[in-house]
């Protein structure tokens, strides 16, 4: 069914959004986790073999009372982020350990606008700056899929590479200047007869130190959950939510606000549409996620518009 062919891809698509985020606790009240983007529709259902191209547009607007940015304390922070992402995912045809296997790479082009009060030694000043360019790349070296009956499981590892521009003298940076390693398990229950689907996606992220600022963001637990109803193979609606908690404090001489642990929760609606375009069935989704509560991090709204185009087997 086309539900299987396309919907499962959104776990890979949406998890890719996390690494360009400027919106979690830690240095800059930010993290390489992007809330609510580790799942969409039938997130753990295995993909068809072959190549898939993904393009999406991400919009985020939020604010936070204070944070450490580029080694400086800033207050009354407002930010807007737009990202256009291109990604290629390849799913292997041969079974591995009784399941299917995929690998992927993601390239973001980002725009970030920041307004904040910069706290100096003698006085404070209001800054307003923006930047456009390449963000931090992400690799997914492995993603394994297994299923039994109506239950599906997806285990994968995400590696964020600090390729985005970073300069401690800048007011705005497109990269975080540290590596992140995120281990994630997605679990889906999908009843094809009723079209009803539940998914849960817990993950645990470990971050390295930003050596330019001597700031290490603490380890983070995140959980995404979604309930979806398919009305046909071409249309579905869902209610999605997330929970985020930083489990170890920030550290290093640059962590002048202490451990700065963050915690947040959010919820919002989602739509999926799979039109027929010639012989192709591209999938389009629209998601809105609103932060209900946030501590030590930006609080705001996320809108994500995505397009998934399954190319298929190479040479076929």
Per-segment meaning from a language model:
Residues 78-86, 128-138, 175-181, 215-221, ...:
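Residues that define the transmembrane beta-barrel architecture of outer-membrane proteins
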Residues 19-25:
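Sec/Tat signal peptide C-region and signal peptidase I cleavage site
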